[in-house]
Amino acid sequence: MAVAVFRTRLWRPDPNRSARWNRGAYLVRAVGHCGECHTPRSLLGGVDPDRELGGNPKGPEGKRVANITPHRKKGIGDWSESDIASYLLDGGLPDGDLASGAMVEVIEDSTSRLTEYDRRAIANYLKSVPPQDGN
């Protein structure tokens, strides 16, 4: 009989980080559960914590989901915090393109309704995570 062990990943504030960073971490990791789509899955089907937010080649709709880490070539490393906050408000990408796929609904029904402070807190957190070379 095989037994699989899954780690429960509860979000806890980091006392060594700012209130803004902790708010962003909370919104990304707990409330928004961004990693459910933006993190690749392990062989057992759970999100791979070693590649957190590094993009998913086959997301929930079977399509590629973007790397949202600060990787300069494969992620959003060239985006400013303002670029990220603006994208979460209206879906506009820095290059003039628009959000597509499931992110349209996420933006319309969720992130566009956040306060500016919360959108900037998310941006601050995303700029701080380790860059991932995936997707």
What are these regions (language model features)?
Residues 51-95, 107-119:
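Electron-transfer interface patches adjacent to heme c in soluble/periplasmic c-type cytochromes
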Residues 24, 31-41, 84, 122, ...:
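The canonical Cys-X-X-Cys-His
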Residues 1-30, 76:
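Electrostatic cytochrome c docking/interface patches
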Residues 95-98, 114-121, 128-134:
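Ligand-binding pocket scaffold of soluble enzyme catalytic domains
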